[in-house]
A protein has these predicted regions:
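N-terminal helix-turn-helix DNA-binding core of bacterial DNA-binding proteins
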Residues: 3-35, 54
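Key DNA-contact positions within bacterial/archaeal DNA-binding proteins
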Residues: 38
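Basic amphipathic alpha-helical segments that dock to polyanions
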Residues: 43-48
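Residue cluster at the C-terminal edge of the helix-turn-helix DNA-binding motif
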Residues: 49-52, 80
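Beta-hairpin "wing" of winged helix-turn-helix
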Residues: 52-65
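Conserved segment of winged-helix/HTH DNA-binding domains
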Residues: 69-94, 111-115
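C-terminal regulatory/oligomerization modules of transcriptional regulators
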Residues: 92-138
Length: 138
């Protein structure tokens, strides 16, 4: 299991937005976080479509959180950018799920792990990742 670059960059970007009360342009965000601007723009568009961030046009425009930082969790971000984290191997085309007894026994282990990952990430909010001495978009 590996978190994608898209999710990694997306979390960094949205966390940066959570630490300011003013909208940030894509350029400013890319520069601050050392992220590729074109790629960041695609990530932010996905987050905007999911109502995790909002954009404002104009001179004082840019991106900001659509909700308070304590109401956005890491699982939401992961699902939007990459879908649910899967640790199990997809079945080979045409293979029955329980073709052999070992398939049934091991598949439950992976499903349980996936459920636990989802639960854990659902309990981690953006606000909980911000150092206490930094004001954040609450």
């Amino acid at each position: 299991m590996k978190v994608s670059k898209k999710s990694y960059y997306g979390l960094r970007a949205i966390l940066a937005l959570a630490q300011t009360d003013k909208p940030l342009s894509i350029h400013a965000l890319a520069e601050t976080e050392h992220l590729p601007e074109d790629y960041l723009e695609k990530i932010l568009q996905s987050l905007r479509k999911a109502n995790l961030v909002e954009s404002k046009k104009g001179v004082s425009g840019g991106y900001s959180l659509a909700r308070p930082a304590h109401l956005i969790n890491i699982w939401e971000i992961q699902k939007v950018l990459d879908g649910p984290i899967k640790v199990s191997t997809p079945l080979i085309k045409g293979e029955l799920p329980c073709f052999q007894p070992s398939h049934c026994q091991t598949s439950e282990v992976w499903r349980t792990l996936e459920t636990e990952i989802e639960k854990s990430l659902s309990h981690i909010t953006l606000a909980s990742l911000i150092p206490k001495n930094i004001p954040h978009h609450s």
